[in-house]
Amino acid sequence: MKSYILILFVGLSAVLHSQNTITGTITNTENEKLLGVEVYINELHKGTSTNEKGYFELTNLPSNTLKITVAYIGYKTEIKTIKLTQEITTLNFVLKESVFKMDEVIISTPFNKLQSQNVMKVEKTTLKQIQNQGAVTLNDGINTIPGVETVSTGIGIGKPVIRGLRGNRVLVYSSGIRLENQQWGDEHGLGVDDSSIESLEVIKGPASLLYGSDALGGVLYFNPAKFAKTNELDLNAGHTYFSNTEGSKTHFGFKKSFNSWKFLANGSRSEHSDYKTSDVYRVSNTRFNETNFNSAIGYNNKFISSALRFSYNRSNIGIPEEIGEQTTEKHLELPYQDLTTKMISFDNTIFLGESKITAIGGYTFNTRKEFEDEHHHDEHEEGDLDEDEHDEHEEVFDPSILLKLKTYNYDVKWHLPKSENFEAIVGVQGMHQTNENGGEEILIPNAKTNDIGVMATAIYSKGIHNLQGGVRFDYRSLDTEEHIIAHEDELHVFNALDKSFENISASLGYKTTLFNNIETRLNLASGFKAPNLSELSSNGVHHGSNRFELGNSDLDSERNYQSDLSLEYKTNHFEITVNGFYNYISDYIFISPTREVEDGFEVYEYIQDDAKLYGGEFGLHLHPHPLDWLHIYSNFEMVIGKQDNGEYLPLIPANKLTNTLRAEFNSIGKFKNNFLSLTYENTFKQDNVGVFETPTSSYNLLNFGAGTSYSFNKVNLDFNLNLNNALDKGYISHLSRLKSNGIQNIGRNVVASLKISI
């Protein structure tokens, strides 16, 4: 396969040599030339920046319609659509100043428009914004996005929650393909490291039209790291220290781009000991380590743009059970998880005159090993001590649960020729997946899953009016093998299943501007989620959740219908946003205790009931003139989830109000990009709890942040310092899986990072 791809690239570079060029000059409204403005074409993975005369040049471009994005700090982002019909095209830009964050192109939605032009409201945050929060992991960092929370097991395991929905209801995309890593478990983490990404986009609400089954609750779309600008070499390395866990993270990066070819590689290694609560106790076995490596090669000419990406992620994560031995040891103790994910994606855009085809293929191999300590105790019951110790060593490295998940994805879309006001896309997506057991215990059976979906979507724009809609048909088949497992004088039987599910999804969205400055979006969408392998066929002890889980082969697909209204009012120095939603889910699947006991564990069974979730987010951003350096942010988020019988759904986030003061000083002598921030988080009491939950008290957290950059010659130094939970507040999150044991979340944490870029 690798040889074939290499031959293909070389052949294309030798045969297809003609090219188109775009040149231009970028100025501000005072006709001053701007240095360092980023000029980028997303579909080509190609970019450059302006020189001291404001001049830029992009060569080797296809004869097609392209979107050119121009972005510069302190100015409004501009995007122009241009049809290349001659070898040299001149395109000039005049940028207007803006005190708000740069508008950005949204990749996760089909027409790749600026956020301000998008019919669907999408939250976007950059890697730098996440890192400026001093987050221990990427799981921790996404909590800063309104409407997004995390179900946590210590600090090493985090499960994204979008507006109260999680697990297989939230789809994760990385490097352009869906990330499959047994995401049905609450103690199964995200599996993405921040060193491999450029930014994160969040679709809140059903996105089955775009992504099929499992996008019922929303999508986390991780955009991969960009290639270097044309004919540039970028090198970077950095180190971060975390005081609470006495942990560290080291990363490196390499990028090199030529006119047609481009390369990148980056990696990271992090290690943490048990985290410490406010009462000075360390939570035993919350230690973890993670190794990450990513590489990519890209090629483009006037007919095609391609990117081949590879990523490797391995995590070893302790499973906490109680507060025991107090130590800063980083070597893992039993029980723990050993997780490995390897991903390959091949992203292509083929230009066909007035239209284009995008085609992405991918392969993911996920291995999940769970090591338990019960074998350790059994080995000491009889026999010679030396022999027992040898056997114990063998047992420690023999996982109780071993799951091998192989996934093949494809996604092909035809972007039809555009007219002045109309764009349309038709496409097909699919997946083939196999699950194989290799451990002593079986929780879910060996299985094969096949998906196929066909979709069509279109947008009509005229003046301030934008109307977008689409329809999609999906089909999923699931076949499992029969297993008969002898365990403690009992037989656990996994009956073979042959199931199929189908669904039609649709969406309709409208965007306009009311009263000249209120951007209004109204979206109606339906989605679905077929029952996953765990929900249909579990039959065993799940040590990660300390319960015996029993599947239900009679489950139907979940279907939901959501309405979403978004209002944005913006002036030069003031911005306010209001988002409200109502989400009705038929046949909502959840796990419930049966009050029976099996193998010493309480039995939980998957059942269904209709449910509804509603709530929203409120945001305010004030930039008080003439205090151009000061920004005031306030965000409030809430969600309520109920079954049709009036009972509350479990694991629904508490209401939260976050207020931030941020001071930005672009230049102080040779120091640039200086900032100071103060954030006060007020999480309210959660007493809208499920039948088997208990209320959670309110709490307040105070966080500080500061950062600066210093440049000399071609070397740039970035330094960040964060003090999170500055008052060392003792608290327990409602979404913490350690709440039932009365174990607090992490206490005060000082985070210091230094990054060197050349």
Feature map (PLM): residue ranges:
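Flexible loop and strand-edge segments within Gram-negative outer membrane beta-barrel domains
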Residues: 272-280, 284-290, 304-357, 361-407, ...
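Short, acidic, small-residue-rich periplasmic hinge/interaction motif at the N-terminus
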Residues: 27-32, 37-42, 69-75, 85-131
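N-terminal periplasmic accessory domains that precede
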Residues: 88-94, 138-141, 158-161, 172-173, ...
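Outer-membrane beta-barrel signature, preferentially recognizing the C-terminal barrel domain
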Residues: 330-347, 446, 494-513, 517-519, ...
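Outer-membrane beta-barrel translocator/receptor signature
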Residues: 181-183, 196-198, 209-279, 286-292
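Gram-negative outer-membrane beta-barrel transporters
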Residues: 581-585, 602-686
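C-terminal beta-signal and adjacent terminal beta-strands/loops
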Residues: 4, 528, 584-587, 591, ...
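Short acidic/polar hinge/loop motifs at secondary-structure boundaries
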Residues: 57-59, 177-204
